[in-house]
Regions:
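Helix-biased detector of long, well-ordered alpha-helical tracts
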Residues: 1-156
């Protein structure tokens, strides 16, 4: 909980009308971005590289869907450990590609860098004509979710 207080504090420093939802809405385009870092969000011993890449895409795509937006494009930033082989990179690619294709999302670029562990950041660019915003929620509205709340945190 201590970190979440720091996160909220940091976000509030920007005092920006676009910050505070699952993504930033500008002219019917939703921009969302999440980091997925080794030993923070996942452990490589628990998931295959394909699963790690797929999950990093899915958590970002879910932000777009939560805002009633259709994912169109993705930008990937991947920090590779020096121990990574070409086969490891192909396995990551398969996870990214499989999810992108399943949701009709095209990977259009990004960045790579060497690192001591695997870190991934994904930006999703989505389109919506009828966005759902947190600011519009009111008492009595139906809130829906999938899975079990808190499960990702519990797993680490």
């Amino acid at each position: 909980m201590f970190f979440m207080n720091k996160e909220s504090y940091f976000i509030n420093l920007f005092q920006n009308q676009y910050i505070g939802d699952d993504g930033a809405l500008l002219n019917n385009t939703v921009y969302s971005m999440d980091a997925f870092f080794e030993n923070v969000h996942f452990k490589r011993e628990w998931m295959s590289l394909e699963q790690i890449a797929a999950k990093s895409m899915l958590v970002n795509i879910s932000d777009a869907i939560a805002m009633n937006a259709t994912p169109k494009y993705a930008l990937l930033s991947v920090a590779f450990p020096s121990s990574f082989t070409k086969d490891d990179m192909k396995e990551l690619y398969r996870g990214f590609d499989k999810v992108a294709k399943a949701y009709g999302c095209e990977i259009i670029g990004g960045d790579t860098i060497a690192n001591i562990k695997l870190d991934i950041s994904v930006t999703i660019i989505s389109q919506t004509s009828n966005p759902l915003l947190r600011t519009g929620i009111k008492e009595g509205d139906l809130i829906a979710y999938t899975g079990k709340l808190g499960e990702s945190k519990r797993d680490l």
